[in-house]
């Protein structure tokens, strides 16, 4: 069913890793871990496992950038199969919120990327209609999605020779999300000219042309919407909904009754509490929504009523992408040391933001049920899971029935040497090391603890004649990727930053990583973080890591020992097989990143909303929220966000100490 196309055959540790993982699935192992070092070909191993197991596959990645990279690779591995992409479709996202002390209501504001929306619909359609499907997704996979039964029930089949009621047919098209437009042909529209109906689904590039003879379908074609060239003549075609959230007239009527019942209960609750302003606000807003739902079948924020449309009880898990797969499918959780903490944190963050909206009468309590899955709910839905990481966390290791190591790189590249040097004169020493790599036309990454240090160090390096830039949290994802593209091209020689792990892009030109303040204990210098940073130079034959420190912390020792263990295994393998390591330079695939760059904008808005809650919470509640969000950001390796929260926490505690509150 699946077939991998590649110029390479499995080598190094790959054949054994593939064999063990496949055998594990055949033995009924629910949870396995692929512990694969950077550059060992984990993606190729994943592809070969999919090929041998032959199940629909979901791959969850921690962000859009990495998801886009995986999507591109799997598309090239599986040209004959359906590889789909499912990530957040927002180009800009400001969540709905309310700040009580300022009486400030912030309306939801979002721009939807039509390309990604189309890819999401295509993914849903492929899962529902094919077995040979691979979906690469971000954590959007656990967010509220339409009911799979609606998507399935509302499609319809058209065949040549079939008699149709034209008016009823066009009404049904409108009902499943298509808009009638006679002039402009866009995805999700249709038009009628005489006996010809042209339909432009969002889930495919081709248009569908239906020619009638009286009430009978005479012919069906697919065509190119740009040049209108006929592509293929069909005997039958299935028309699928063009939106994720599609519902029926019966469901709308049922939902309205249920919403009115909840409204009545919540108004009674507010009146007992003496909250007459909140009651009046809620009544007015909800009745406006009901009026729109009754007249148009839609209202702004309709997703907040999804529980009523789905017929779910309060607290029941929402439908998500996982529900479209059925029972028998394979899940890879890529970069699991980041993705698992993300999956854990999504529900808590969503609930915190909505609490004020419900408490102050902007939303009914059913808004709580328009949410991502809780981690336990997600965990109950997945049956065959393979975690993939160079540094799997305790959860992955402790729950796996098998941990499969992939240490040997087919390229022969060895993990970099790690040196520990004193902090005295560290900047002068760093400049000397940068001078050496510049002569070889190679690049360097320097990781520091604060944004201020990054700025000052980058400025100093520029003064020394070095082409340097710093990456910081104010840069959006496109700008950050642009910096790394400049680094690869040689327009920049050194990048300085607090968090150089986020992108996860291949940087084979980088041969030096310098870690300043390596002996500062904390989330920025944990064992996992240090191993990940060391892996940044594992793709270059001259790879070298310098830790500037005056003592060796337990985290440093563990990271260095693990790196040396991996070096030894690779060196012995190279010697045995006569392999001479070479730096592998991959071309920079710029196109895959252009459409998918909004994760950080959403994270920034979330942090901003947290800071705004300062005025509506007690000091104790605000400190607790800051701590929770700081640890959440750190566990997801979003170190700049964690540092901003840490600084805010420090400022609050200083003010408390000085009694300036």
From Swiss-Prot:
Segments forming domain Helicase C-terminal: 426-592
Domain UVR, residue spans: 620-655
Subcellular location: Cytoplasm
Locus of motif Beta-hairpin: 89-112
GO terms assigned for molecular function: ATP binding; ATP hydrolysis activity; DNA binding; excinuclease ABC activity; helicase activity
Positions with a binding annotation for ATP: 36-43
GO CC entries: cytoplasm; excinuclease repair complex
Domain Helicase ATP-binding: 23-180
Cytoplasm among keywords: yes
Subunit structure: Forms a heterotetramer with UvrA during the search for lesions. Interacts with UvrC in an incision complex.
Protein role: The UvrABC repair system catalyzes the recognition and processing of DNA lesions. A damage recognition complex composed of 2 UvrA and 2 UvrB subunits scans DNA for abnormalities. Upon binding of the UvrA(2)B(2) complex to a putative damaged site, the DNA wraps around one UvrB monomer. DNA wrap is dependent on ATP binding by UvrB and probably causes local melting of the DNA helix, facilitating insertion of UvrB beta-hairpin between the DNA strands. Then UvrB probes one DNA strand for the presence of a lesion.
HAMAP family: UvrB
Stated name of the protein: UvrABC system protein B
Organism: Thermosipho africanus (strain TCF52B)
């Amino acid at each position: 069913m699946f077939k991998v196309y590649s110029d390479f055959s499995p080598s190094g540790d790959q054949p054994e890793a593939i064999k063990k993982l496949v055998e594990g699935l055949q033995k009924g192992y629910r949870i396995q871990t692929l512990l694969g070092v950077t550059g060992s070909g984990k993606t190729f191993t994943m592809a070969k496992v999919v090929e041998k197991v032959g199940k629909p596959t979901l791959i969850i990645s921690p962000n859009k950038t990495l998801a886009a990279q995986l999507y591109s690779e799997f598309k090239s591995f599986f040209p004959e199969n359906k590889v789909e992409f499912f990530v957040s479709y927002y180009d800009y996202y400001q969540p709905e919120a309310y700040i009580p002390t300022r009486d400030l209501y912030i309306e939801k504001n979002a721009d939807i990327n039509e390309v990604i929306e189309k890819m999401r619909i295509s993914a849903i359609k492929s899962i529902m209609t094919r077995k040979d499907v691979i979906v690469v997704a971000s954590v959007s996979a656990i967010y509220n999605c339409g009911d799979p039964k609606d998507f399935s029930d509302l499609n319809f089949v058209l065949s040549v020779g079939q008699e149709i009621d034209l008016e009823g047919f066009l009404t049904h098209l409108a009902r499943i999300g298509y808009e009638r437009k006679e002039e402009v042909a866009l995805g999700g529209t249709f038009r009628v000219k005489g006996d010809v109906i042209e339909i432009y689904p969002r889930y495919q590039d081709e248009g569908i042309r239906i020619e009638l003879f009286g009430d009978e379908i005479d012919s069906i074609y697919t065509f190119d919407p740009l040049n209108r060239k006929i592509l293929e003549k069909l005997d039958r075609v299935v028309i699928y909904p063009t939106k994720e959230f599609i519902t029926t007239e019966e469901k709308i009527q049922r939902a309205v009754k249920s919403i009115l019942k909840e409204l009545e209960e919540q108004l009674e609750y507010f009146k007992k509490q003496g909250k007459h302003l909140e009651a009046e606000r809620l009544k007015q807003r909800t009745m406006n929504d009901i009026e729109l739902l009754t007249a148009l079948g839609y209202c702004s924020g309709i997703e907040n009523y999804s529980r009523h449309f789905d017929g779910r009880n309060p607290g029941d898990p929402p439908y998500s992408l996982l529900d479209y797969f059925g029972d028998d499918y394979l899940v890879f959780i890529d970069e699991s040391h980041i993705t698992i903490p993300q999956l854990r944190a999504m529900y808590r963050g969503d609930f915190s933001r909505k609490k004020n909206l419900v408490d102050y009468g902007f939303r009914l309590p059913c808004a709580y049920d328009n949410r991502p899955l809780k981690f336990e709910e997600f965990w109950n839905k997945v049956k065959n899971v393979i975690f993939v990481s160079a540094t799997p966390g305790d959860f992955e290791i402790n729950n796996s029935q098998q941990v499969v190591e992939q240490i040997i790189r087919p390229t022969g590249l060895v993990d970099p040497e790690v040196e520990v040097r004193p902090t005295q004169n560290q900047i002068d020493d760093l400049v000397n090391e940068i001078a050496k790599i510049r002569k070889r036309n190679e690049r360097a990454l320097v990781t520091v603890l604060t944004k201020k240090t990054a700025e000052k160090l980058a400025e100093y390096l520029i003064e020394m004649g070095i082409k340097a830039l710093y990456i910081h949290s104010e840069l959006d994802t496109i700008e950050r990727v642009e910096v790394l593209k400049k680094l690869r091209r040689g327009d920049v020689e050194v990048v300085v930053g607090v968090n150089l792990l986020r992108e996860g892009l291949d940087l084979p030109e980088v041969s030096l990583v310098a870690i300043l303040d390596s002996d500062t204990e904390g989330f920025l210098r944990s064992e996992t973080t240090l191993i990940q940073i060391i892996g940044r130079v594992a793709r270059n034959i001259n790879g070298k890591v310098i830790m500037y420190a005056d003592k060796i912390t337990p985290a440093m020792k563990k990271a260095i020992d693990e790196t040396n263990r991996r070096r030894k295994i690779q060196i012995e393998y190279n010697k045995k097989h006569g392999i001479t390591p070479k730096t592998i330079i991959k071309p920079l695939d710029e196109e895959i990143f252009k459409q998918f760059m909004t994760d950080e904008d959403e994270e920034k808005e979330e942090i901003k909303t947290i800071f705004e809650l300062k005025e509506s919470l007690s000091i104790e509640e605000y400190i607790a929220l800051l701590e929770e969000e700081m640890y959440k950001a750190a566990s997801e390796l979003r170190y700049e966000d964690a540092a901003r929260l840490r600084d805010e926490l420090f400022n609050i505690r200083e003010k408390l100490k000085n009694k300036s509150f």
